[in-house]
């Protein structure tokens, strides 16, 4: 599959620094407190990354990468030196073709020693995805346990539904600062969903339709920062469909979702210009899994059989899943 998804607002929206409910005060100076080396010199290693492809090979990554240094062999967050002060802010890099592009927004700067590096990023794609993704960032503190922190869904207030998320890739790998580069092989930890709605006669969609949106249930509430495992697959994500320029279909640019529970509930909600709301519901035949994209093509049945709010039929339902 061609690479999909572009990266327009990522730096501001997902990787714009870290916050904490109980922030620890910064520690000044390179004190070498990284598990035994005792070296005051701070090292900023070269950073490279690859990302998995549909055939399970790795290709050089372009996009945004964040690096979270932990104490060796643990999920305990060590932190990162910024201007010789130990802070909870992770390293932040823009990558092109696997290599750092220009000066990093925030370089990894650490004393010589062994660390457990956690990597999260969003690759840049040639084709667009949903333009308004959002996530809740983890709360980072020096010495905190990253296995108790999460990337979470952001609620679509005042509604009870949630926004789609960014395309997130992840890796964990030990590193010896001072003797080696940082080189991460990233794997995608979210699923993609694309919905296409057509008229049953392959003609122009009815001018009586004001809008369409999709609700997809059984979506994980959050991903563990340390393990990338999905948690609490009970939430509903919503997104709109957009009318094509020729008026023959409504669809969405691929949305990214945290993995779902088995047989998530799909709802297509159509609002007519007279205010009537029509809803179609059906469970998907399989869960939305990390590193896959489901394209769902629907052919509308008769949505005008009832004058009042009610259901409608789908004449054709086609699910096509692929690795991304």
Residue ranges and their predicted role:
Residues 4-55, 291, 307-324:
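Bacterial Sec-dependent N-terminal signal peptides
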Residues 48, 261-324:
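Hydrophilic extracytoplasmic domains
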Residues 48-60, 196-206:
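Structural motif
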Residues 74-188:
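Short, low-hydrophobicity acidic/polar segments
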Residues 120-124, 198, 271-275:
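Beta-strand-rich extracellular modules
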Residues 148-204, 294-324:
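Compositionally biased low-complexity segments at domain edges in trafficked proteins
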Residues 174-179, 245-248, 287-293:
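Solvent-exposed, conformationally flexible loop/turn segments
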Residues 192-253:
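Short helix-loop boundary/capping segments
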């Amino acid at each position: 599959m061609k690479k999909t998804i572009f990266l327009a607002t990522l730096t501001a929206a997902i990787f714009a620094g870290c916050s904490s409910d109980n922030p620890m005060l910064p520690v000044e100076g390179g004190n070498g407190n990284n598990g035994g080396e005792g070296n005051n010199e701070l090292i900023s290693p070269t950073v490279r990354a690859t990302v998995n492809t549909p055939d399970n090979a790795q290709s050089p990554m372009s996009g945004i990468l964040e690096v979270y240094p932990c104490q060796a062999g643990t999920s305990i967050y060590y932190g990162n030196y910024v201007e010789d002060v130990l802070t909870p802010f992770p390293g932040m890099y823009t990558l092109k073709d696997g290599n750092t592009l220009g000066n990093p927004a925030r370089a990894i700067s650490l004393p010589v020693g062994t660390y457990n590096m956690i990597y999260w990023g969003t690759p840049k794609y040639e084709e667009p995805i949903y333009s308004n993704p959002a996530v809740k960032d983890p709360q980072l503190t020096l010495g905190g346990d990253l296995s108790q922190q999460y990337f979470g869904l952001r609620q679509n207030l005042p509604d009870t539904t949630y926004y789609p998320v960014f395309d997130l890739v992840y890796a964990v790998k030990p590193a010896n600062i001072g003797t080696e580069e940082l080189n991460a092989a990233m794997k995608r930890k979210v699923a993609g969903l694309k919905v296409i709605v057509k008229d049953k006669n392959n003609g122009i969609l009815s001018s009586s339709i004001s809008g369409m949106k999709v609700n997809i249930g059984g979506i994980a509430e959050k991903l563990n920062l340390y393990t990338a495992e999905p948690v609490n697959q009970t939430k509903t994500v919503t997104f709109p469909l957009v009318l094509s320029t020729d008026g023959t279909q409504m669809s969405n640019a691929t949305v990214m979702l945290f993995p779902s529970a088995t047989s998530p509930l799909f709802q297509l909600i159509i609002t007519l210009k007279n205010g009537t709301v029509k809803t179609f519901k059906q469970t998907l035949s399989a869960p939305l899994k990390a590193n896959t994209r489901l394209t769902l093509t629907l052919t509308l049945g008769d949505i005008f059989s009832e004058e009042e709010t009610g259901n409608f039929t789908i004449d054709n339902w086609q699910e096509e899943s692929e690795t991304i």
